[in-house]
A protein has these predicted regions:
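N-terminal leader/targeting and pre-domain segments
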Residues: 1-176
Length: 176
């Protein structure tokens, strides 16, 4: 029986469990060319989310993913709902747009050390737990208008190169 080799991506001792993509040493999520894999990436991401839902998982680990774009608007991420609550995006690169409009996050969300090449949109979101955008590079506009941060919101050491819109955002706990 031939076993497919796993992705070569490593982060703080974590080994990516996904199979290699085409002739790359990386999986579809860590493959360096976002344009080349766009359709495969979206289908694989939807399958990963569905798999985590069916397992009853409480988190989705997307550390180091190289996103062509991501659209997860109007979703509720909750351990008691259908989508896993905790989202881990550390060190990911977003080459396309990032859209989470009207989403509700019941657990931690971690975007630390991410690079955003295109606009990011988190309008009218609710973060019930800590959210981290530490040490990020945001190269385009970002919109957090009307977003509610119920716990700690950290943007420390983040570089904003475009307009950062926090109009009508509510910070109920510590913001840095």
């Amino acid at each position: 029986m031939l076993k497919m080799a796993n992705c070569a991506f490593r982060y703080n001792g974590h080994k990516c469990p996904h199979p290699r993509y085409q002739d790359s040493k990386y999986c579809v999520f860590h493959h360096e060319s976002p344009d080349e894999k766009c359709a495969d990436f979206q289908a694989s991401l939807e399958a990963l989310i569905k798999e985590r839902e069916e397992e009853g998982a409480d988190s989705i680990d997307m550390r180091g993913f190289i996103f062509p774009d991501i659209e997860l608007s109007n979703k509720t991420f909750s351990a008691t709902g259908t989508l896993p609550a905790k989202l881990e995006f550390q060190t990911s690169h977003f080459h396309g747009g990032v859209v989470f409009r009207n989403s509700i996050h019941m657990d931690e969300v971690n975007f630390s050390e991410c690079v955003f090449h295109q606009p990011i949109e988190f309008q009218n979101c609710t973060f019930q737990h800590d959210v981290a955008f530490r040490k990020c590079e945001i190269m385009a506009t970002c919109d957090f208008s009307s977003t509610k941060f119920h716990n700690e919101a950290s943007f420390s050491n983040t570089t904003f190169q475009g307009v950062a819109n926090f109009r009508f955002a509510e910070f109920r706990e510590k913001a840095s």
